[in-house]
């Protein structure tokens, strides 16, 4: 019931205990407003303690809050703006614009806590989402409505890949994108905003940030804010939406920060005992339905490179595809620096992608794997000592590696190469010609930073001419 008022009885960091004397307790997940000198603080009800007290987690700093302060139950969960009006804007966890571009007058407001689509509404994701990026479409295709884990350290091109995906979905498919920065560095969010403005992608994108310096409550819920905006586009507008979450690990980390303060006994490695439930509640809402789909690309930080750590291990259970960015490939000057042997996809299956696509993808990986094995021999004995068959494999592998590079639209102003979108059919045809030996007499330099195979032929002619 809205209007029920209480009093703060305890403040421990971001966690507040509030007593409601009238015996009418707010529901779990209700938003509580606390007027303070520095502005209104919003908190979310997490637990009921006894008959008259609730334990809440604050969404902003609790500095200046003291016992005895009044608190009002809003009667509803945190609600955020949704609809076309959110595109091109930046929001915080509460759905308040933070880009100083004036207020937002949205189509509607929706609560951030919602049920996942029911089994009857869900549509299994066995359709490829064409990205126009050769290495992704061929070797680790994304499923419409699937979940993709993006593994990459600093400076390997994670942000550029994200921006290119947003641009391609917006331009080629007319879809919308939501970018959610969970525990992001403010600087990175700022850079992304400026880059998106410069490349014109921002018009079809909404951005939601819960930065690294914000309390754990904000970082724990900002993922749900972005997801709620994406769900509206899927359910009410029938869109295929792209949802970026960077970084999903920090969502788990925020939960573990408040878990002990809420009185829960920690589980393995100090994580919250509700880890699987928390991750599942977010991931299960990201799905394809009869109306549209949400495809999510989630950056995954792996603590100390330990894939058995409970946080990444729990996330892996939900992923359909993994795109691994490699520093070794960056060192070769090949962008996007996707590792073709480490990246995987559940839908790289002849029943989904077709026999031809599957066979060519596996053959490409086979050639690259054999080339990797031969590198030690080449380093010791040199190329001349290899049998003819292995020499051919190495030459083809070098061409494949270079042909996996591709100029991006969002990088045009930096690289000088015109961006290329390559349909899947063209990608398959190009790699088939390399595997079949039709390109054996063409210099490997002709394959670097090209879109379709026709461009390789043209470059080869120019080199000869």
Curated annotation (Swiss-Prot):
Protein role: Produces ATP from ADP in the presence of a proton gradient across the membrane. The catalytic sites are hosted primarily by the beta subunits.
SUPFAM superfamilies for the chain: C-terminal domain of alpha and beta subunits of F1 ATP synthase, N-terminal domain of alpha and beta subunits of F1 ATP synthase, P-loop containing nucleoside triphosphate hydrolases
InterPro entries associated with the record: AAA+_ATPase, ATP-synt_VA_C, ATP_synth_F1_bsu, ATPase_a/bsu_AS, ATPase_alpha/beta_chains, ATPase_F1/V1/A1_a/bsu_N, ATPase_F1/V1/A1_a/bsu_N_sf, ATPase_F1/V1/A1_a/bsu_nucl-bd
Segments forming a coiled coil: none
One Pfam match: ATP-synt_VA_C
Region forming the signal peptide: none
Chain sites annotated for binding ATP: 152-159
Annotated catalysed reactions: ATP + H2O + 4 H(+)(in) = ADP + phosphate + 5 H(+)(out)
Topology of this chain in the membrane: Peripheral membrane protein
Record's subcellular location: Cell membrane
NCBIfam families reported for this sequence: atpD (TIGR01039)
Protein name in the entry: ATP synthase subunit beta
Subunit and partners: F-type ATPases have 2 components, CF(1) - the catalytic core - and CF(0) - the membrane proton channel. CF(1) has five subunits: alpha(3), beta(3), gamma(1), delta(1), epsilon(1). CF(0) has three main subunits: a(1), b(2) and c(9-12). The alpha and beta chains form an alternating ring which encloses part of the gamma chain. CF(1) is attached to CF(0) by a central stalk formed by the gamma and epsilon chains, while a peripheral stalk is formed by the delta and b chains.
Main location group: membrane
Organism of this sequence: Ruminiclostridium cellulolyticum (strain ATCC 35319 / DSM 5812 / JCM 6584 / H10)
